[in-house]
């Protein structure tokens, strides 16, 4: 498990789960999440490769979870400072990746689903 007291972590996670239960995907896409301050990212690369073979998000507190993340989810975590909404991040990544409309919609759905998971496990905080 992570370091620190579990009570506040568990209470926050339960509160977030309850809040998310009432939100549809559009409302989740409008959230402006914040990365929890204890989360770190680890990348495994083959020398000379442009893309990592594995990206891990590690929780230093709470339950000390480790999650494998896609490049898109790692990008979301990397910019989760409360300024941009999940939908804005998805649109920016889709534009930078030059995705067609169907792939952009799939990316948005992936980020919304990942946001739900990252919020309910304490990797992200709801923000605004």
State each model region's role.
Residues 1-68, 72, 77:
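Rossmann-like AdoMet/SAM-dependent catalytic core
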Residues 61-128:
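Long, charge-rich, low-complexity alpha-helical segments
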């Amino acid at each position: 498990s992570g370091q620190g007291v579990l009570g506040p972590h568990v209470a926050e996670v339960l509160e977030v789960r309850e809040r998310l239960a009432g939100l549809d995907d559009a409302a989740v896409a409008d959230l402006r999440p914040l990365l929890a301050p204890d989360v770190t990212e680890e990348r495994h690369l083959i020398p000379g490769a442009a893309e990592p073979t594995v990206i891990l998000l590690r929780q230093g507190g709470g339950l000390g979870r480790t999650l494998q993340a896609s490049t898109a989810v790692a990008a979301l975590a990397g910019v989760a400072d409360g300024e941009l909404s999940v939908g804005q991040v998805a649109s920016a990544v889709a534009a930078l990746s030059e995705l067609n409309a169907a792939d952009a919609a799939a990316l948005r759905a992936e980020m919304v689903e990942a946001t739900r998971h990252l919020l309910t496990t304490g990797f992200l905080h709801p923000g605004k």
